[in-house]
Amino acid sequence: MPNNLLPTPTPLATLLRMRPLFLGLLGFAFLTSTGISFAAPIANSLKTIRAVGAEGKGNAAAAKAWQSLAKAGADQLPVILAAMDGANPLAANWLRAAVDTIAAREKKLPVAALQKFLADKSHNPRARRLAFELIRGADAKLAAKLIPGMINDPSVELRREAVAQVLDAGKIANQPAIAVKEYRKALDAARDIDQ
């Protein structure tokens, strides 16, 4: 049969043959646009909150931004915690309140991402402490395993628990040599006078 005698496919037939490709592209476009629409408000909210200043400067805008930020999912917790890096104390309070609100609402926290955030010692010490507390609330056994590794942490707040744990080990040691070793280790790492 000659090629010119084949029936010409109708536009509908062509569209039906391309349906999987069309649906895939449509789904990709939807997911991409949705991701952008969620990421943009979070970035804008973080920027607005970080701009809050003394004497109420930016507080009204920060309150609106906080409402938007507090609706974020738990997967955004590391991003919000990272925004505490270099933030002034007022902005850090707004960010901490958003983290607390999200953590209280969400049933499952991104423990692995929080642990990665905690391990990065370049982050704000209070943000890292908050990440640790979130980990402790989600997985107390994991948090207990992390404490000994904080004995030389640059964050005094995180180091304190590790030092306290070593002091306790020295107190319960039955052998004086072990107790002295534990106390020396604790004294080398302690940064607070009361320890």
Where are these regions (language model features)?
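N-terminal secretory signal peptides that target proteins for export/translocation
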Residues: 1-18
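Bacterial N-terminal signal peptides
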Residues: 21-34
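Boundary at the C-terminal end of the N-terminal hydrophobic targeting segment
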Residues: 37-39
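Mature N-terminal segment immediately following signal peptide/propeptide cleavage
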Residues: 44-74, 78
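Buried hydrophobic core positions in alpha-solenoid tandem helical repeats
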Residues: 45-50, 79-84, 113-118, 146-148, ...
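Structural detector for internal amphipathic alpha-helices that build alpha-solenoid repeat scaffolds
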Residues: 60-72, 93-106, 116, 126-140, ...
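Short, charge-rich amphipathic alpha-helical segments embedded
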Residues: 72-92
